[in-house]
C-alpha cells in the first residue's frame, strides 16, 4: 500500500474525477497542471469538498457554495483521513497553513481506454471567474483505482486506491540492474539534449538570410517549424534547464537505490516536457511495473530522436534533388510551397469572423503570391491543366453511360453530380468528396464482360477432374450450366434454328448463372473448386471473406455523407475484377454476424446477412443498390459461389436463394488418391526438389499411405494430410542437404523420422474390453461430429443397485457423458420401450424373475469422452439395445455398430450423415452396421456418384448390390432395419428363432 501509511492493512479512499474538459491532458506525477473548466462542470466537485467540515475553512474554497454539491456524499471521513496520509508524505513543500486539511483528488485521463490508473493530485490554487474556474493541480503519485467507473463524465465518485510504489519494486533490483538503469537514463537524456541543441542551431542558421543555402530547405519544412516552436518556448527552455541541472547534481552522487529512484521520478518529468503523443503518455501513465515503464520511456524517447534523423534525411534528399534540378523545376517546387501557403491562409480567412483579420489575410495572400510573376503563372497553369484533364475524363465517362448500359437512375444521378462538380472550385468542401466518388464509379466496369470462348464440355470435364478428385455433385451442376451456355451458343450461331421462340432478353434470363452453396467440413476443397470453375469458364476470380462481418455497410457500402465512406465489398470485387461477369466467391457465408446480444447490432449496424439477400437473389440482383454508388448496378451476370461449414449459421431466407451442394468428407481411399496424385507433387514442387534432376522419385508405399491417413490425421478434409506430406518432403530436403543423396521410397517404418509418433489410438482404447467388467450392456452407436466426420459412439450400461422392497416401477437409469436434451429423451423412450416389450413377453426365453430384477434395479448409462457434448436422436436404437442387453444379460458383438432413431412403437426412423457414419465405422474397424431401411437412398449415394448407376442400384431390390459394393470398399457388412426386432434379429440371430410367446406375463 505504500511506505507512509499508518498500518499496512489500512485502506485509502480518494475522490476520482475524469478530465472531460481537458481530453488531451495526461497527468503525470511531479508535474503541476493549470486547468480551466466551465463553471457548471466543476463547481459541484469543489462544493463536495466544502460540504465536509474538515475542508469547510480551507481558504481555497472561500468562493464556493455548498448548495451545489452532489446528492450522494463522496467526501466523507475516509477521504479526509486518506488526504491527511497523502499530505503527510507529499505535503512538505511550504504549505501555508499546516492546520488545514489539503484537498487530494485522483485525476483520470479522458482518452484512456482503461481508467484504473491515474494521478493522485493536490489542489494548490483555485481561481473563480464569471463562467470559468481555473484549478492548479500538483500531481504527486501514480495510483491504481480499485473501483473504476465508466461514463461518469463530470461526476465525482469515491474509490479505494492503491499507490503504485516504485520504491518497493526498486528494492527488488540488484546492484547491477540499478547501475544499468542509471547509465541508460543519463545516456538517453544527454543524447536527447545534444540532438535538440544541434537542431536549434541548424534551424537558427536556416532562418538567417546569410545562412547556408542547403540549410534553407529545413526552414521550409512544416515539421521543422513545429518542432522549433515546441522546443524553443520559454516554458520548455526553463523546464529543460532545471532538469539538466538536477541531473548534474544526481550524477555526482553514489549510484544506489535512492539515486535510481530520483532518476526514475525524472522520467515522468521528461515525458511531460518533451512533445510526446497522447497515446505514448497514456501508455506511460498506465504502466504499473517500473521495469516496463523504463522500457517504454526508452522507446518513446528514441522514437522522438528518430524524428530528427528522418528530418535530416528528408532535407538531404530535397537538397540533392534541388541541386540537380533545372531552374524551371526549382520554380515549380517553390510555387507549390507558395500555393500551399495560400490555401492555408484562405482557410484561416474563412474561419475568421473579424473583418480586420480578413483584410490582413487578403493582404498577406497578395504579398505571398506577388513577388515573382513567373511563379504565379506557372502555378496557375499547372492547376488548370490538372483540373482540365480530370474534367475531360469525367465528361467522357458521363457521355458514354448509355453505351455502358448504366441504369437510367444512375445516368440522371451522375449527370446531376457532374454539373455540380463543374461549378465547384478545388477549395470547396464537397469538391474532393465528389472527386473520390467519380473515381470509384469510373472504376466500375460497366458494359465490360469477359467473352467466353467456344465451350468444349470434354475439355471442361477434363480440367475439373485434373484439378480435383471427387466432388462429382459440383462438377455435374457445372456441366449442366455449361451445357445451357452451349445451347445458347449454338442457337446464336446457327441461322437455321428458330430463335423467335426465345427472344434475346428471354435467352439472357435463361442463361442466368446459378448461385451455388457448397457445404462441407474444412479442407474438402470448397474454395479451390471455385477457382477451378473460374478457370474453366474463363472468368476473373474474386474472393470475399465474410468471416466476422458485422456491419451491413461492408456489404452495401457507406453512405456518402460519412467521412471516409467507401463502396461495399461486392462493388469493390467488380472494380478489382475489371469485368461485370466475374466469379465471386463468398467464403464462410455461415460466419456472417447478424447482430449482437438482443439484436442490438441489427439496430445500430444493420444486418449483413440480410444485405446478402438482394445480392444472392437472381430476381433482384440485376438492380443491386450500393449505398455509396447510389444507383442500381446489374449483378445478374456474376457467378456467385458460397461456402459454409454448417447450415445452422445461415438464415432460412438466405438458404432458400441458393442451390445447396453438400460435400462430404473424403474416404481413406480418396485421401490416399488425392495425396498421391495432387498433394505429394505439389509439396515436392513447393520445396524445390523438382528442380534437382538426379534425385530419385519420392513416393510412399501403400502401408505408409494407410498409416499417414489413418493414424497421423483425423479429419474429414485433407489440410492436415497436406501438412504431414509437407513434413515428409521437408525431411527429404534436409537429408539431401546433409548427405547429397536421398532414398525415394518412404515406407511405414520411416514415418516416425519425419512425423514423430502417431496419435494415440483412442479408437482401440475405447473399444477394448476390460478384465473385470460385464460383457453385456455395451453397444456401439454411430455419430456425426461437428467437424463433418463420423465416429463410433460407445454406450455403456451397468447395474448399480437392486431395490430389496420389490417395487416394480423401475428401472431407474442415471446418465453421464455430457448428454443433450434430445439424447436424454431418447434414453427415456428406450427405457419405456424395453419395459413394454418385456412386459408383453415379446422377447422369448425371459422369465418372470429376470423381468422383476430388471424392474427393481438401478442402472447407470455412460457415454465416454465426457469433454465432448453429445446430442441428437440417432442413438435411440443403440440405447434400446444396450438396456435390453442388460435386462437379458446377453452381450453384443463389439464389431457391431448401429444408428437410427427409435419410437415408442419400436419403429427405426431415418437419420442423416450416413456416409460420414459409415466412414467412422470403417475407421473404428467395425464388421457389421445396422442402419434404418428408410436410409436406402443415402446408402446408394454413399457407394456411387453416378446418377445412372445410382438409379440401377436403387431399383434392384432383389440383389441389393449396394451392400456388396460397400463391403468391397469398406469391409463393412450392412443390414437394413425397419423396426427394433430387426435390430434384435441381426444382433442375436439365435434368440428370435425360438418360439415367441405373445401372452402377457404374470407379474
Swiss-Prot record:
PROSITE patterns given in the database record: LON_N, LON_PROTEOLYTIC, LON_SER
Domain of life: Eukaryota
Record localization: Peroxisome matrix
GO cellular component, one term: peroxisomal matrix
Residues involved in ATP binding: 520-527
SUPFAM superfamilies for this protein: P-loop containing nucleoside triphosphate hydrolases, Ribosomal protein S5 domain 2-like
MF (Gene Ontology): ATP binding; ATP hydrolysis activity; ATP-dependent peptidase activity; serine-type endopeptidase activity
GO BP terms, alphabetized: protein import into peroxisome matrix; protein processing; protein quality control for misfolded or incompletely synthesized proteins
Bias (Polar residues) ranges: 368-377
Active site: 874, 917
Domain Lon proteolytic span(s) in chain numbering: 773-969
Reactions the enzyme catalyzes: Hydrolysis of proteins in presence of ATP
Positions of the Lon N-terminal domain: 14-305
EC number: 3.4.21.53
Pfam families assigned: AAA (PF00004), Lon_C (PF05362), Lon_lid (PF22667)
Residues covered by region (Disordered): 367-389
Record keywords, A-Z: ATP-binding, Hydrolase, Nucleotide-binding, Peroxisome, Protease, Serine protease
Family the UniProt entry places it in: Belongs to the peptidase S16 family.
Described purpose of this protein according to its UniProt entry: ATP-dependent serine protease that mediates the selective degradation of misfolded and unassembled polypeptides in the peroxisomal matrix. Necessary for type 2 peroxisome targeting signal (PTS2)-containing protein processing and facilitates peroxisome matrix protein import.
PANTHER family in the cross-refs: ATP DEPENDENT LON PROTEASE FAMILY MEMBER
Protein name, as recorded: Lon protease homolog 2, peroxisomal
Lineage, top ranks: Eukaryota, Fungi, Dikarya, Ascomycota, Saccharomycotina
Amino acid at each position: 500500500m505504500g511506505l507512509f501509511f499508518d498500518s499496512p492493512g489500512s485502506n485509502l479512499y480518494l475522490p476520482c474525477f475524469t478530465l472531460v474538459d481537458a481530453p488531451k491532458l495526461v497527468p503525470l506525477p511531479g508535474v503541476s497542471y493549470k486547468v480551466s473548466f466551465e463553471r457548471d462542470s466543476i463547481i459541484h466537485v469543489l462544493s463536495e469538498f466544502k460540504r465536509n467540515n474538515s475542508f469547510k475553512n480551507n481558504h481555497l474554497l472561500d468562493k464556493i457554495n455548498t448548495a451545489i454539491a452532489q446528492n450522494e456524499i463522496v467526501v466523507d471521513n475516509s477521504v479526509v483521513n486518506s488526504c491527511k496520509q497523502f499530505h503527510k508524505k507529499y505535503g512538505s513543500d511550504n504549505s501555508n497553513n499546516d492546520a488545514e486539511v489539503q484537498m487530494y483528488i485522483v485525476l483520470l485521463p479522458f482518452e484512456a481506454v482503461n481508467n484504473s490508473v491515474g494521478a493522485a493530485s493536490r489542489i494548490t490554487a483555485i481561481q473563480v471567474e464569471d463562467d470559468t474556474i481555473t484549478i492548479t493541480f500538483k500531481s504527486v503519485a501514480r495510483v491504481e483505482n480499485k473501483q473504476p467507473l465508466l461514463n461518469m463524465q463530470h461526476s465525482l465518485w469515491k474509490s479505494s486506491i492503491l499507490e503504485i510504489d516504485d520504491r518497493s519494486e526498486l528494492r527488488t533490483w540488484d546492484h547491477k540492474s540499478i547501475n544499468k538503469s542509471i547509465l541508460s537514463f543519463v545516456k538517453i537524456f544527454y543524447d536527447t539534449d545534444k540532438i535538440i541543441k544541434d537542431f536549434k542551431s541548424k534551424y537558427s542558421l536556416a532562418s538567417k538570410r546569410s545562412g547556408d543555402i542547403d540549410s534553407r530547405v529545413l526552414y521550409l519544412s512544416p515539421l521543422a517549424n513545429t518542432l522549433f516552436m515546441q522546443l524553443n518556448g520559454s516554458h520548455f527552455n526553463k523546464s529543460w534547464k532545471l532538469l539538466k541541472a538536477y541531473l548534474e547534481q544526481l550524477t555526482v552522487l553514489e549510484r544506489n537505490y535512492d539515486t535510481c529512484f530520483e532518476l526514475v521520478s525524472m522520467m515522468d518529468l521528461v515525458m511531460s516536457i518533451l512533445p510526446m503523443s497522447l497515446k505514448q503518455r497514456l501508455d506511460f501513465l498506465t504502466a504499473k511495473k517500473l521495469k516496463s515503464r523504463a522500457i517504454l520511456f526508452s522507446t518513446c524517447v528514441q522514437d522522438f530522436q528518430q524524428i530528427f534523423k528522418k528530418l535530416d534525411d528528408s532535407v538531404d534528399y530535397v537538397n540533392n534533388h534541388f541541386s540537380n534540378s533545372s531552374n524551371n523545376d526549382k520554380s515549380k517546387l517553390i510555387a507549390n510551397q507558395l500555393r500551399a501557403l495560400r490555401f492555408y491562409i484562405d482557410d484561416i480567412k474563412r474561419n475568421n469572423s473579424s473583418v480586420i483579420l480578413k483584410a490582413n489575410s487578403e493582404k498577406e495572400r497578395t504579398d505571398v503570391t506577388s513577388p515573382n510573376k513567373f511563379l504565379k503563372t506557372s502555378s496557375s497553369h499547372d492547376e488548370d491543366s490538372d483540373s482540365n484533364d480530370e474534367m475531360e475524363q469525367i465528361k467522357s465517362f458521363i457521355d458514354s453511360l448509355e453505351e455502358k448500359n448504366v441504369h437510367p437512375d444512375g445516368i440522371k444521378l451522375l449527370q446531376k453530380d457532374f454539373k455540380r462538380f463543374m461549378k465547384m472550385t478545388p477549395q470547396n468542401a464537397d469538391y474532393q468528396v465528389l472527386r473520390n466518388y467519380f473515381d470509384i464509379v469510373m472504376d466500375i466496369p460497366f458494359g465490360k464482360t469477359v467473352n467466353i470462348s467456344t465451350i468444349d464440355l470434354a475439355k471442361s470435364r477434363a480440367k475439373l477432374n485434373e484439378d480435383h478428385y471427387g466432388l462429382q455433385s459440383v462438377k455435374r451442376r457445372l456441366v449442366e450450366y455449361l451445357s445451357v451456355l452451349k445451347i445458347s451458343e449454338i442457337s446464336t450461331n446457327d441461322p437455321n434454328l428458330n430463335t423467335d421462340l426465345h427472344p434475346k432478353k428471354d435467352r439472357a434470363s435463361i442463361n442466368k448463372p446459378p448461385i451455388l452453396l457448397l457445404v462441407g467440413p474444412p479442407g474438402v476443397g470448397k474454395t479451390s473448386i471455385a477457382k477451378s470453375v473460374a478457370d474453366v469458364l474463363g472468368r476473373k476470380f474474386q474472393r470475399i471473406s465474410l468471416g466476422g462481418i458485422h456491419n451491413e455497410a461492408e456489404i452495401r457500402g457507406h453512405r456518402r455523407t460519412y467521412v471516409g465512406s467507401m463502396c461495399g465489398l461486392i462493388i469493390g470485387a467488380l472494380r478489382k475484377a475489371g469485368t461485370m461477369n466475374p466469379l465471386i466467391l463468398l467464403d464462410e457465408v455461415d460466419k456472417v454476424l447478424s447482430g449482437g446480444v438482443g439484436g442490438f447490432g441489427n439496430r445500430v449496424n444493420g444486418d449483413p446477412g440480410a444485405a446478402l439477400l438482394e445480392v444472392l437473389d437472381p430476381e433482384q440482383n440485376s438492380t443491386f443498390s450500393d449505398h455509396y454508388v447510389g444507383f442500381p448496378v446489374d449483378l445478374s451476370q456474376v457467378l456467385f459461389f458460397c461456402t459454409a461449414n454448417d447450415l445452422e449459421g445461415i438464415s432460412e431466407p438466405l438458404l432458400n436463394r441458393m442451390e445447396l451442394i453438400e460435400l462430404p468428407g473424403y474416404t481413406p481411399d480418396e485421401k490416399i488418391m488425392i495425396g498421391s496424385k495432387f498433394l505429394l507433387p505439389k509439396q515436392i514442387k513447393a520445396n524445390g526438389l523438382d528442380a534437382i534432376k538426379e534425385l530419385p522419385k519420392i513416393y510412399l508405399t501403400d502401408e505408409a499411405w494407410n498409416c499417414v491417413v489413418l493414424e497421423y490425421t483425423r479429419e474429414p478434409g485433407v489440410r492436415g494430410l497436406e501438412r504431414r506430406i509437407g513434413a515428409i518432403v521437408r525431411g527429404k530436403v534436409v537429408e539431401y542437404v546433409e548427405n547429397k543423396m536421398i532414398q525415394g521410397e518412404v515406407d511405414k517404418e520411416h514415418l516416425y523420422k519425419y512425423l514423430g509418433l502417431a496419435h494415440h489410438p483412442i479408437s482401440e482404447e475405447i473399444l477394448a474390453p476390460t478384465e473385470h467388467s460385464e460383457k453385456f450392456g455395451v453397444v456401439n452407436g454411430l455419430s456425426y461430429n461437428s467437424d463433418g466426420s463420423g465416429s463410433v459412439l460407445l454406450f455403456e450400461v451397468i447395474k448399480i443397485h437392486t431395490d430389496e422392497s420389490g417395487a416394480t416401477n423401475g428401472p431407474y437409469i442415471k446418465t453421464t457423458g455430457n448428454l443433450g436434451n434430445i439424447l436424454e429423451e431418447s434414453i427415456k423412450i428406450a427405457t419405456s420401450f424395453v419395459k413394454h416389450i418385456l412386459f408383453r413377453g415379446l422377447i422369448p426365453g425371459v422369465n418372470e424373475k429376470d423381468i422383476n430384477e430388471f424392474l427393481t434395479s438401478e442402472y447407470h448409462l455412460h457415454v465416454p469422452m465426457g469433454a465432448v457434448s453429445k446430442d441428437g436422436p440417432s442413438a435411440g436404437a443403440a440405447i434400446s439395445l444396450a438396456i435390453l442387453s442388460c435386462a437379458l444379460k446377453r452381450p453384443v458383438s463389439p464389431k457391431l455398430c448401429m444408428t437410427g432413431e427409435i419410437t415408442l412403437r419400436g419403429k427405426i426412423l431415418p437419420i442423416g450423415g450416413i456416409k460420414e457414419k459409415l466412414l467412422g465405422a470403417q475407421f473404428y474397424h467395425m464388421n457389421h452396421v445396422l442402419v434404418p431401411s428408410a436410409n436406402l437412398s443415402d446408402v446408394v449415394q454413399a457407394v456411387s456418384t453416378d446418377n445412372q448407376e445410382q438409379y440401377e442400384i436403387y431399383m434392384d431390390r432383389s440383389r441389393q448390390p449396394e451392400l456388396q459394393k460397400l463391403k468391397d470398399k469398406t469391409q463393412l457388412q450392412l443390414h437394413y432395419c425397419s423396426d427394433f426386432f430387426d435390430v434384435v434379429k441381426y444382433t442375436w440371430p439365435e434368440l428370435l428363432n425360438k418360439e415367441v410367446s405373445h401372452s402377457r406375463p404374470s407379474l
